[in-house]
């Protein structure tokens, strides 16, 4: 997406506000990968997610952290604990030690497990594939850095930034346990809502997203399958039956099933 600068004047009551927002994709763009975005609003620099590309190895799997000035990021928001949104968070923290990191309590618990497992996987790849950059961080690094995470519940309003000038609120995204979109409101009153990955339908164990239905000035939304029309005959129960049959057929012919 590159750098998108939005400047506008708008009347709120009797006050005339000047709004400056910039949004920069530092994740590689145009594919599912190392999700990471820089949002600058009212002078506050915020990073949304810090993922690792699932199909690349070594430094090529990381976002472009070199585009961030050292120690310039004030807050980091994690939408959920899948590695394409989480996998390089400790690297970002080392490069941006002044940044506070925010996520939901469930995301914090899952992220710790996911990242410790990632250390094991990267260490094995270093030995098996000779990828000398791995691991990006160690178990000890993770234990130290995770102490700086702040767990915030959905619908809890809190302030972020060096000047505490941005209001933040998580909303349940329905994607996985602990997933959340985040509403950010600058001192100008302009709001930005970042969805992260979202699922609006109820799943077997996770209810669908509970997002705000108003009050959003700028929306940043995932659209992984946004270009595809869902069949008019689609239903979740029927898809579950199809999925079960596919598993059964695979096992009957001696195949393996990884979920």
Residue spans of the language-model regions?
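His/Asp/Glu-rich metal-coordinating catalytic cores
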Residues: 21-77, 82, 86, 91-259
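Short, Lys/Arg-enriched N-terminal segments with co-localized hydrophobic residues
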Residues: 3-19
